[in-house]
Amino acid sequence: MELSSRKPYFIEEEEEENLASSLSEMEAGFSGNNNNSNNHGNPQNGVVSSSRFSYGRLNSLRNSQSYYYNQYSVSSPRSVVSGRFHDFRFDIQQPHFLDSCFLCKKPLGDNRDIYMYRGDTPFCSEECRQEQIERDEAKEKKQNLSHSVKSAMRRKEQSSPTRSRDYAFHNGTVAAA
């Protein structure tokens, strides 16, 4: 099996008509230098009147398209994902979440207890678990405090939108000359 020598090639079957039309345009452009007025529009020669592309050639391209689709989507070491290649060699393998303690990163296992927190966070001891609980509570308090301060400031600004405390106004008569 010579997987390394093959180049990735994939054509979706849905794009068969688009492929045939673009190939016919390419063929017409390629053979555009050979203007044979004898063959143009002659149905006996298998030439389409609007382009220089034969129906027989079009069918052979359709057949070769399914050949490439079937050959490379099955035998390629890569998986076809929504019409694109996905190369599994570059996937980073994440360790299983129960392999190590979330806080101190000590390996778990060897018939030792695993202490869980919030359903999917493993710890090697009750102390590590408790420390994480305290960290999360402190973070939540800080977020709640900042949220309550912000909402209090908004309420304060909304209650007196027309009042301006920063500017000094002088009440009195102004005379202009």
From Swiss-Prot:
Zinc fingers, FLZ-type class: 96-140
Bias (Low complexity): 22-46
Function: May act as an adapter to facilitate the interaction of SnRK1 complex with effector proteins, conferring tissue- and stimulus-type specific differences in the SnRK1 regulation pathway.
Keyword tags: Cytoplasm, Metal-binding, Nucleus, Zinc, Zinc-finger
Subunit structure: Interacts with KIN10 and KIN11 via its FLZ-type zinc finger domain. Interacts with KINB1, KINB2 and KINB3 via its N-terminal part. Interacts with DSP3 and BBX21 via its FLZ-type zinc finger domain. Forms heterodimer with FLZ7 and FLZ15 in vitro.
GO BP field: cellular response to hypoxia; response to glucose; response to mannose; response to starvation; response to sucrose
InterPro entries (alphabetical): FLZ1/2/3 (IPR044533), Zf-FLZ_dom (IPR007650)
Pfam families in the cross-refs: zf-FLZ (PF04570)
Locations listed in the record: Nucleus; Cytoplasm
Domain of life assignment: Eukaryota
GO CC, any one term: nucleus
Region Disordered, residue ranges: 22-49, 134-177
Induction: Down-regulated in response to mild as well as prolonged energy depletion. Up-regulated by glucose, sucrose and mannose.
Listed name of the protein: FCS-Like Zinc finger 1
GO MF: kinase binding; phosphatase binding; zinc ion binding
Record family assignment: Belongs to the FLZ family.
Biased composition (Basic and acidic residues): 134-143, 154-168
Primary subcellular site in the record, as a coarse category: nucleus
